[in-house]
Every structure is written in structure tokens, then in C-alpha cells.
Amino acid sequence: MIRFFSYFFLILILSLKVIALEVTLTQGTVKPTPIAVTDLFSENSNFEKIGKNISNVISDNLERSGLFIPLDEKAFIQSNKSLSQQPRFEDWKVIKAQHLVAGKIFGSNGKISVEFRLYDVFQQKQLVGKKYETSEKNWRRVAHIISDSVFKNITGEGGYFDTRIVYVAETGPKDNKQKRLAIMDQDQANHRFLTDGSYLVLTPRFSPNSQKITYMSYVNRNSPRVYIFDIETGKQEIVGEFPGMTFAPRFSPDGNKIVMSFTDPDIGNSEIYILDLKTRISKRITDNSAIDVSASFSPDGKKIVFNSDRSGRRHLYISDVDGKNVKRISREAGSYYTPVWSPRGDMIAFTKQEGGQFYI
């Protein structure tokens, strides 16, 4: 059985008014790398289709990243039918391929074994070779794992292809919309709903191992509360015993804590709390008359970034995980929301509202 390791960042913009969404993409500055992805060969015709499907998913993944251009298989001079011998690198140089992905597939009784090799065509050497064994129904996941390996060995950065997306799906007539918690693979495959739409769900976030989801929900149709949903069991549980509204949750990097905001009905403003999921003990991180919300842990778990109106407008702040050493990091005009740290910790993504427009 293949184990699941996936990471995901989701930025969700919520507004009370539905407006047309316009997304402007600027041109990239990196020239995509030509790469040849051959069909996985098999001595058993029953697995040829699966092998081709795996290769197609790998090609699609790499192309969508914007860093690779998979070459047309019609241009291939050599047809790889063995992994025991080195490819004829000159044949791949002729068609301008800088890297080559080749592999084979075999199996029986509902099980498959997939081997692949990644070659550097110009250096004429193998960069990586791996073998995966799993059930036949997991062939698509194997393709994503191979894609991640190819991506990492060429770029030096971890891939994102073996990941899932959690989001709020809105369906139904205009006057009776249903908002359901849903997940799918990063390439839109394997979509399914997790909740039935009988109650409102918002701001879902994955745990580090992607087996649990924390989100805000109106399960009781009263005050919104933070919940955790277990994907394997389908069970959900409320997070913490708070007398007021809890919202904007995120997991810590180790998955053992949740940072969220709490609005005390006796005070009215929102403060940030960290709840230990093992001990169920919560700790208040901010303490002032301002609204402090949308906290996110740094990758090492030592700091948090959040937005606050303590300066008069919504701006971004960083503090130690205990709330000390608060520092404002946004200075330009506009209001700032939903900050989240990059996996490397060198950047922070956020939503900005200025002049009636939203920007990411």
C-alpha cells in the first residue's frame, strides 16, 4: 500500500456579495525545459493501457507546472523497451530533449509494479531510478509520485503533484445554495463531497499529513465554531470549549496544535488562541482591544503571522508563537487578509483589498 504524504496551501477569499472573478496572469520569466516522457512498456498487453495512462498523467503534471515542455511522442526516434540498457542519448539530443523519463509496468492479481528512470540527456547519466508496488487501482497516485520525483531531481524543489485540494463547493439554486466540504486531487481527479450541505462550512485547511481538515461551521445554526473532520472515519468534532465564536483555524506544522481566533461575547473583539489537540489546553496569544485574526504558523512552528486592525486598518503582523516580539510587516495602502507562510518560510502569501479590488 502506498502511503500518503501531501501538503497544500489554500487561499480563500470570502465576500458577502457575489462578484465576477477576474484573474490576471503575468508572463513567466523561466523558459520551460524540454522533456521526453515515454510510455511505460509492458510484456503483458493487459498493462499497456495503464502504462500509457501513467505516462500521460506524468506529462500533464509536468506541463501544468510551467517548468517543462513534454515533447510530442511522434518525434521520438528511440522506443525504449528495456531499462537494463542505457538510452541512445544522441537520439534524444536530436529532438532537443534535455531529460528523459522511461519505465515499465508489470503485475498480477490486481497488483502492479512500476519502475521508472530519469535521465539527464546532455550529461548522459541516470539521475534517479525507483520502483513502486501497489494495487492496480492506485495507478494514478503512482503517476503523481513519479512526477514529484522527476520535479525534485531536476529543480531541487519538492513537487506538489501528489497532493489534494480541500475547498467549499457551492451548488444548488440561487435562492437555496448549499456549501459542502469537498476534496479532490490537484489535477481535479477523485473528487468527492465530505459533508451533505445541511450546514454551512467555511475556510477549510488540511492537517500536515492531509488526513484531517479543520474548518469553521454553523452546525447548530447558531454561533460558528471550529471543527476537525477526519477523512478516514468521516467523523467531525468541535475544537475547544469556548463560549463564543471561534473561526479562522490552521494546523501547526506538526499537526498537534491549532491556531484560531475567538470572539468573546462579553468583550466583542477577536483574539488569537493556540489549542493543544492532545491536552485540549488553550493559550491566548494576543491581548488588546483590536481585532486579531487569520493566524498562520511559520514552517518551523516558532512564529505566527496574522492580520490586525490595531493600527486603524487591517495590516499583517509577525510575532513569536507565544505572542511576544510583535512586528508589523505591511506598510503600503490597503487592507490585508488571510496571510500564510510558504513551505520554505521565505515568503508570505496574502489577500489585499484596495480601491474596491482584491489582489493576491
Protein language model features and the residues they cover:
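Amphipathic beta-strand/beta-sheet edge segments enriched in Tyr/Trp
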Residues: 22-25, 82-149
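Hydrophobic beta-strand positions that form the internal "hydrophobic ladder"
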Residues: 165, 213-214, 255-258, 301-305, ...
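Short loop/turn segments that connect beta-strands within beta-propeller blades
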Residues: 122, 185-189, 230-234, 276-280, ...
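Short beta-strand->alpha-helix linker/helix-N-cap micro-motif
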Residues: 26-88, 101-105
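Bacterial N-terminal signal peptides
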Residues: 6-17
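Residue-level detector of Asp-centered blade-edge/turn motifs that repeat once per structural unit
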Residues: 159-161, 208-209, 253-254, 299-300, ...
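A flexible loop/linker signature enriched in serine peptidases of the S9 family
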Residues: 158, 170-180, 197-199, 217-225, ...
